Every structure is written in structure tokens, then in C-alpha cells.
Amino acid sequence: MKNTKQAIALASAAALSVGMLAGCGGAASSAATASSESNSTATAEASTTAASDGTLVLAETGFESKFSPFFAASASDQDVIDLTQIALLGADRKGEMVLNGIEGETREYNGTDYTYHGPADCVVTENADGTVTYDIKLREDLKFSDGEPVTIDDVIFSMYVFLDPTYDGSATMYSTPIVGLDEYRNSMTTLSKLIAEAGEDNTDNTKFTAEQQKAFWDAVNDGGVKFAQEIIDKCVESGAAADANDAAGAASAWNLGELPAGATAKDMFELIGANYDWNFSAMEAETAGTALSDLIPEDVYAYSTTGVNVGDAVASVAGIVKTGDYSMTLTTTELSTTMIYQLQMPIAPLHYYGDESLYDYDNNSFGFAKGDLSSVRAKTSAPMGAGMFTFSKYSDGVVYLDANPSYYDGAPKVAHVNMKETQEADKITGVQAGTIDISDPSYSLEVADQIADINGAEGEDGPVITTRLKDYRGYGYIALSSKNVNVGGDPSSQASKDLRKAIMTVIAAYRDEGIDSYYGDTATVINYPISNTSWAAPSVTDDGYQIAYSTDVDGNEIYTSDMKSEDKYAAALQAALGYFEAAGYTVANGQITAAPAGAKMEYQINIGASGNGDHPSFQTLTNAAAALKTIGFTLTVNDMANASDLFASYQSGAAEGWVAAWQSTNDPDMYQLYHSQGATNYYAINDTDLDELIMAARATTDQEVRKTMYKEAMEIILDWGVELPVYQRSEATIFSTERVNIDTIAKDQTPYWTYKSELNNLELN
């Protein structure tokens, strides 16, 4: 769920919805290793013989000190995990999974063949009964950094941590359809959920004590009410709630769900609890300021990670089967397109994070007592794994790592890595001054100019700083609500679609100018509602590829290749008039003079441009609004200084149009955003054909088939006129040219394959 705090953090058109395999996905950077076909042998030989030397300094935004492969949450903490762990399976530069890691898979990217290796092989078999089996085999030469061998028991232990009913990290393996998983998890619940569902007036203390019940409800009535009241007050401040007693209005604006009129702050807190299964750490996502952990007692907070058996005990997950010291199978009840991505999970050492005396596979004991992850939680300050580097210490904002001589793809070429907390303002000057070797400044035209000034010349390669750009794993868009922008109250009618396409056609024409002005060559205009970094994104060379909203109401192309900008703007307006007329508007002499019943002559698009026009899409919208004004139609661009107001406006369903951005995961599943039952289908799109395509794409693992389905689905979305894809921006990594051997940096970096993916091969000058 989105909240005001998240909205503020994401207001700068970076991302609205973050989807990731946090806690396990990031470690994939150490799960697959790659070398170009032309020098793979030489690289492999060098990596096993070269001596580690020197210290490499990396800039990090800030640590939370949760250095655990199971519980790391912040990006910087996850970076530490990436470098100290290996994942079971990895992905290539396109985000596609590498299933033959032991022998390696060769795949082409940007004209170069790269061979990817990893810790394991995985054979996926779709069975006749509808189940799917994942046959996993580990390399037999893997070692943890302390010299202990990596076996399938470590994998099984790690899986059971992620699947435990009390696990409250950010990985979501527990949501997959593994055979027997529901029975395993449902045979135990958390103490917090049990007490909450029993109710404050409960008199049956069979499963918990009266003292525990009283402590829980005392915490709810005190800290819980304060937590909810902060949300209400925040909504009152932004105008989304009437007053301090308007819990119902605030719950709706905060996207928590519905509460009846007269509901209290306590009712709101109980709604939040129900939304998150009374997992207090998960409920922290809804904070309006104060952490829930600061409002309720520590012992009560721990109730949400305390397991209680209910019903018949189920000691194991039937779908997880050990077949050898280095092999296992995992079986799901049905095909799940996301299951394979969950296998990017880290392989954590049982002997370090668990209790070896409690591991007995044959007797359903997996390294800890079910419902008790205390031994795992106790190891969050010093990670151990089989990754490129070993953790030394964390002190004064710096994480110190040492080269792992046992790393399966060869010992790193640098002896030490210091990961240093760095302010944004120092990420460039630090590299210039020589105190930082690699950093990731927020990239913009101003940053590019600053680097050019330091280097004395423009370009990616300079004498002081070398820059490497890659596409950001997300995109910016402009949306229209089908519920609020339609003709005659029917969002799905052809007239309603034509109305929205009339508006979008004009806005689309001004994207190039607006994005070039804001980003220069650090962003590109996109034409389909998907990040260009996804394997499912249509390519310009694909059959049927089209510029978004570039045809008129009769399906004819609006533009020609020799058109100048002004000609394109005029052509877009002419096409818009055709759409308006088809929607039922009265059009005469190039002017719109009247709207049909249930439609208007004016609509509004909300944009979070800080109240001063600072947004990539602001110029695009204002230019389009000015153009539409010339034909008698008013498009109001509402620049909202308070990001929470923007997010509340469309999450509550009130906005007619808005501007935001999505971030994508490896898997391009569209259910959440575009299915009629999707939780974040703010467009209110409801199309049977689209729903069927989305579900069909979930029912196959054939990427070519899925890509075709997704393209057809995206064409339906565009035909509804509810979304205009606008831009794909770049993000940068900068290197000290003087300190880092630039020739040893990973080539062809992508969001799925960064310089850290091959950090063991990087050398210092």
C-alpha cells in the first residue's frame, strides 16, 4: 500500500510503485558470472591466479545495518549482501534467468556473446497433472568464506527461513504455490494475529495468556491509536480528511480501505493490522512519521514474529524434496511465472545462521524450530556467505570488506572494498578528489555538465571521471482515469476511448521536446507501457511497432518522416479534432463548441512538479494544453507542491488525470496494474480481452509467447487511452579514471547487470 511518506520520497518522478525481490533478488548479482565469448578463457585463468591488491572505495547512500540475506531492506544494506552472498540462480543482462549455470549459457547482448555461469542448474518440467517441478542441482565445489562446503542443506535451510510463518522480511517466496506450503504456513499463526482476531473481549486463553492479551490491547489502545491518529492528522493537513475525527476519510485517502462513518483512530489501526496480517514490521509501511516500534512495547512488537500452532501441526513443505547432497526438487501446484525469479534467493550458511543440531531433514527439522527465527535474526550485523567478499566490520559509516579467496568464479583482484556512506552532493566531488573510486550520482543535464567541467571535455570517458550510463528499470507516464474521463458514464464505450485518445494524441506529440529539454540525451521517449529494460518490451524493429497515439480516428498514420516539429503539432491537433468529433463533441471550423452528454469541455491532469514546474513531463503537458486551447478545449495542468496530495488524488479515484512513474521487476506480469481486479489499477480499465490476455500470459513460461501476448495487451491499454508512456531515463555510475582500470569494468551494463556483477574482475591502476 502506498502512503504519504512513500509519496514524498517518490515525488520526483522516480518511481510510484516499487516491485522487487528485496532480500533475495539483489543477490543475483553474485549468482551469475559472465565473460565475453572472445576472452572467456583468459578471464577465467586470470581470475584464479591474480593476487588481490589495493582498496576500492564505493559510495553508498546510507546503511540501516540490517546486513542479513534474509532481512536486508535498504538499497545500501542490500549492496552489502550482494557482495557477500551468492544466489541459487542468476539472471543475464536482459533480466532473463540463467538455468544452466554449471556449464554456462552463452547469450548475445548488444552484438556481443556473453557466457553466464552460476552456482546451480535448474530444469523446469510442466507435468501432466498441472504441477510444475523445478529440479535443482548445485555445483559441488562451492565454499562459504569460512571454508565450509555449500550443500543442498544450506539451500533447504534458507528456503524454510523464507517460508516460515513468522518470517517478516521483504522476500515473498511464501506467496508462491509450492505444494504443501499453505498447509505448512496455515498450521501456525503469529501471536499478534491470534490475539487480534480473538478480539479485545476474548475470554478463551487456550493459545495465549490473559497477560499477553492485555498487553496487546493496551499497546493497540495507546501506541496503535497514536500511529493511526498521525495518519488522520496528515490527511487533514493535506485536505484529504475533514477533521481529526475523520478516520473514514483518511483511510480512503491513505488507500487503506473502507471504514464506516464515525469510525475511530482505533478502527483505522485495526484495519491496518488486518491488511498486514498483524505483522508490525510490515505495518511500518503506513507510518505518517513515527515508527510503530517507537509507539508500542518491544515485547508486544515481538508478538508478530512469535509463532503459535493452530490446528494439526504440519512440520514440512511437501513440495520441497531433497534428492542428494547437492540436489533437490521443488514442486508447485500450478504454473507460476514468478516462481523461477524467487529462486534468485541467497544460499545462506546453515552452520552460521541456523542451528546444525536442529537440522535433520529426514525428521522434518530444518535448522531452527518452526516459528522461531531468533537465531537468524541474531545475525544481522555481520553477514557470512559465499560471495566475492567477506564482511570485516561496519564502523563510522563505512562497511569494510575483504576479498574472498574461495569465491567460485575466482578471487577478486582488489584486496579490500570500503563501502562509504556518502551524501548526494559529494558523489561527484568525492571521485574528483580521490576519496571515492565509484559512485552513483542522480543523473541529469546538470550532473553531465559538472562532470564535463571536471574532465575539461564532454563525453563518457574523461581523464578524471569515466561515466557509464544504463537505462533505469522503470518509466514515466501520463494517465487518464477511464472512470472520470468518459462519455455518458460508460468508460469502455468507443466514444469514451475516442475522447481520451483525442487528449493523449496531442500530449504525445510534445513528448520529444519536453523530455529533451529536461533530460537531454540521458532519457528517451518510449511508446509502450513497459520499461525498455524488460525482455517483454517491444523493439523498434518488431513488426507492428508504432509510436504511441500516432494514428487518426480512421487508423491512418498522422505523421510522415519528413515532418518538422510544427507540422507534427498541427497534424496532432487535426487528428484530435477527428477523435473529439467521433466522441460526440460538436466540431465546426476547427473548433470544439460543445461536449456530448456526460463529457466536459475541460479536464484536469495533476502533476507533482513541486509547485514550480520541476518535472520531466511538465513542459510536455503545458505545451499540449496550450495547443488544445487553440481548438477550444481546456486541459488544466495542476502542479501540486505536496506529493501526498498527488498520490491521494488518484489512489482515491478522484483524479481525472495524473503524472507518475512505475518501476518494474524482472517479470513483466501486468495483473496488478491493468487487470480489472488489480490492486493498483488506478486507470479503472475493465476489459475482458485484456483480462484474458493477462491471465493467459501467466499460464505459460514461453517468453516469446508471453511477449506476443503482452504486446497485444499493451495495444489494448493504449486503445483505451488511459496511459501515455513518456520517458525512459538513464542512471549513471561514475568511476575514477585515475584509480580504476576502466578496461576491467563490466561491459554493457544494464539494470540487471551492473559493475558489481563482475566486481571480482575489476582492477585498480
Language model regions located:
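Periplasmic binding protein-like
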Residues: L58, G147, V431, I436-P441, ...
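N-terminal lobe/hinge region of extracytoplasmic solute-binding protein
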Residues: A59-D129
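Acidic-aromatic pocket-rim loops
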Residues: A171-Y184, M188-A198, G462-V464, D471-G474, ...
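Append "and occasionally in soluble cytosolic enzymes with long acidic Gly/Pro-rich linkers
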Residues: Y400-D402, Q494-A626, E763-L764
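Ligand-site clamp/hinge motif
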Residues: P405-A452
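Long beta-strand-rich cores associated with HINT superfamily self-processing modules
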Residues: F735-N765
